[in-house]
Amino acid sequence: NIPDEPSRFEGKYAVIAPHASAHAKYWMNPGGWQAVIDYLNNRGYKVVMITSEKLGDPWHDSKLGGTLKGVIDKTGGHIDLMDRIIDIKHASLFIGLGSGLSWLSWAVGTPTILISGFSYPVSEFGDCYRLFTPDTQNTCNGCFNRHWLNPGDWEWCPDHKDTPRHFECSKTITTEMVIDGIKHYLPEEQQKVEEVIEEVKKKSFLGKFF
């Protein structure tokens, strides 16, 4: 059963889970996670990071473009599952990868943004904001659905390992795509977009056509 406990945080917050069991699952757009955190912080949202990989560990941080700033640190393997459930349940939003924490977010009913280029969108649950490799660049994607994953190879990228196209399925997912997902789920952000559109209509000759 889902614990019926109040939120541990005051005010609105989002949860992020930027680590996973395979490197191919990571979102490897340089600086992407920090830009998303800054976007949320600047709009009054706390950002809670919940992964078993400890924040501040140089090796793990290097996979995220450096040590993330502006987060509430709830990382580490010492935190039990029920604690994770409570934090996710009361969040306004969850942003994660093709990993177990994303499935947990979906299971408790929290709006979920799932970032994955190495698996096709049909691989996970449907009712989420699913971010996939842009289809405008003829970019490689979906290797998880086309090849057997080698869990012993951290740099597993069956089509482009050791080439400039290594992990391009993930690198080409932009920060703007993730922010669009945030706007989709957070009503006040969507309202701001609509207000800007209306203002443009009023001030521009394009308003005659709307």
Q: What are the language-model segments listed below?
A:
Residues 3-7, 58-61, 83-85, 140-144:
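Short, solvent-exposed polar/charged micro-motifs at secondary-structure junctions
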Residues 30-123:
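Donor-binding and catalytic core of enzymes assembling or modifying cell-surface/extracellular glycoconjugates
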Residues 1-25, 189-192:
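Mid-sequence helix-capping/hinge segment at a functional interface
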Residues 202-210:
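Long, low-complexity, intrinsically disordered segments
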